[in-house]
Curated annotation (Swiss-Prot):
Pfam families: eIF3m_C_helix, PCI
Subunit structure: Component of the eukaryotic translation initiation factor 3 (eIF-3) complex.
One of the GO BP terms on file: cytoplasmic translational initiation
This protein's name: Eukaryotic translation initiation factor 3 subunit M
Molecular function via GO: translation initiation factor activity
Location of the PCI domain: 188-356
Amino acid sequence: MTIFIDLASLEDLYNDLISHIETLRKKKGSEYSVADYQILIGEQRTVEFLSKIVSNETEFLFKECKDSDKDIEGFFNVILTILHKLENEDEINIVSQKIRDSLSAHPTENSQLKIKILTNLFNSFQPKSTQRYDIFFALVKLASDSNNLEFVKYQITDIDSWLEDWNVSIQQKRKLYKLISNIFKEKQRMLSHQFLVKYLQTFTKEDSQEAQEDAVRVCIESISLQELYQSDYLLDLPAVQYLEGSTVSANSLTYELMKIFATEQLDSFLQFQQKNPNFLSTIGLSNDDCLQKIRLLSLATLTSEQSKVPYSLISKMLQIDENEVEMWVINAMEGDLLDAKLDQLNRIVNVNSSTQRVFNKSQWSQLGQRFSVWKSSVKNLLQVIENAKTTQVKPFYFQTR
């Protein structure tokens, strides 16, 4: 948090602010009258004074003084100092909003400085201040509109804990998550998908109908994102579950297809295709891309169930020629779906580890069995060590006279 320590009186700050603008106006040959400002100051209408001077002077500063960042930032620093002398929360919010709106009006003009000033405004409030939400939203929007995506990406790393600190409403969460998702929709699709999921997580069974368009979108994304191999988390979202029973045929089919990619195998996908031959293209999916992904997912499932997998079994499951098996295994390894070694002599894939597409009761049972085996192995090893200690030959010494 930025701490403002200013021993000047309000009257001195007002005069400094007006004098600062007056000097800049004269330098640029711009007509300027302080009468309106002085009336507001004289009547102690601080909020109106701050709102008016921010509205009137921001555009001038960024157009006529664009080569003097120091003068512009100095103006807003005085504004912030006065702002934090206000005691009424509503008044603070009015001025804060005026600053946000004025800086966001022309986002592409001197955007870096505007982002810096908004950041100063954000940091001037306590970490748990509710004011921070609206400022942060404006910051993200401004950075997006001015194509400063790396700034946005850097700022959102702690977003969930911040939202908790600010005690925001569900609607505020949705608004921010949706904004961030849309910002990265074209250029960083995985990040966009993650925030779309966060957005949909805020819906319950009662209001899921409101999110149908976005639920369809998240299902399609889970299929089209080639680097996304685990998507069973979508099955737990009420907004996505609502699609299953939708009266809109395309919505229910999208859910069915998403579920195949989340939990099922190649044969289920081929059956779906046979029943709905043109559906993939209608929702913007490539048949070849989908076929490649479902084969990789099917391979992950197969290799998660056994540690030694014959080429012939992989060939049968993926419906490919046996000579293509090694290529598919290598592709799966490059995508971090599995870690394995190819035994070309015996035509077997020796699996070290494989991605679990789902983690349900069956997987917990497998994990429990493995822990039991490890526990037994460790117990036997400890027993061997203990036996070695007790049977160890004790050294003897020759006695000398």
